[in-house]
Every structure is written in structure tokens, then in C-alpha cells.
Amino acid sequence: MASIKFTTKDIFEQDFKIGFRGYDQDEVNDFLDDIMKDYDAYEAIIKELKGEIARLKAQAANSPKTTLPTEESNDVLRTERPSSATNFDILRRLNRLEKEVFGKQIVQDQE
């Protein structure tokens, strides 16, 4: 996990050297104030998320365990799928055969 290099206090107490044609000191201070506000917001978010993680871990520890499908039940599911597909194929073939057989009988009966 990455470590935090600066705190809001570090940013607040940072001094910059003023050189010839240096940066506007008020502009730098305003920018650093915004950064400090962001750091405070990030710290609050982190604290809130850590609390939520702890709450969810406790909830997970206290909740009943759900069982995951075992290899045996997976095998049963795998064997059921081909049979249902086979049943569908059989019904489709039977339907075609009935149309073929009964269709010819209807034509013969009409003659």
C-alpha cells in the first residue's frame, strides 16, 4: 500500500523561497489551501470506508455461510443440459415426421 508523504499540517507549514520573478505568494497559498481541503476530504473518505469495511467484515463473520455448488452438483447440471437439448431435438424430429406422414395421408385422402 502506498504511504502518504504529506499531511495537511506539512502542507500548511511548508515555506517556499522567493526568487527573482518568483511565483505570486498569494496564489501559491490559495492553491495550497485547496490541496489541504482535498487532503482533509480524502482522510474523511478513507476513515468512512475503513469503518464500512470493518462493518461488512463483522456482518460477513456473523452471517450464515452459503454453500457453493460442489463438483457433484456441477456434474448433474452438465448431464441434464444435453438430455434436455436431446429431448428438444427429438420433439422437433417427431414434429417433422408427423408433418411428413400425415401430410401425405391428407393428400392421398383428397385424391
Swiss-Prot record:
Q: Which Pfam families match?
A: DivIVA
Polar residues bias spans = 60-71
Alphabetized, the UniProt keywords read: Cell cycle, Cell division, Cell shape, Coiled coil, Cytoplasm
Mind listing the GO biological process terms from this record?
Answer: cell division; regulation of cell shape
Q: Listed GO cellular component terms?
A: cytoplasm
Matching entries from InterPro entries are given as: Cell_cycle_GpsB (IPR011229), DivIVA_domain (IPR019933), DivIVA_fam (IPR007793)
Give the coiled coil ranges.
Answer: 32-63
Q: Where is this region: Disordered?
A: 59-80
Main location group: cytoplasm
- Localization per record: Cytoplasm
Q: Which family does the similarity line name?
A: Belongs to the GpsB family.
As for what it does, the entry says: Divisome component that associates with the complex late in its assembly, after the Z-ring is formed, and is dependent on DivIC and PBP2B for its recruitment to the divisome. Together with EzrA, is a key component of the system that regulates PBP1 localization during cell cycle progression. Its main role could be the removal of PBP1 from the cell pole after pole maturation is completed. Also contributes to the recruitment of PBP1 to the division complex. Not essential for septum formation.
Tell me the subunit arrangement.
Forms polymers through the coiled coil domains. Interacts with PBP1, MreC and EzrA.
**Protein's UniProt name:** Cell cycle protein GpsB
> Taxonomy-wise, where does this protein's organism fall, top ranks first?
Bacteria, Bacillati, Bacillota, Bacilli, Lactobacillales
Gene behind the chain? gpsB
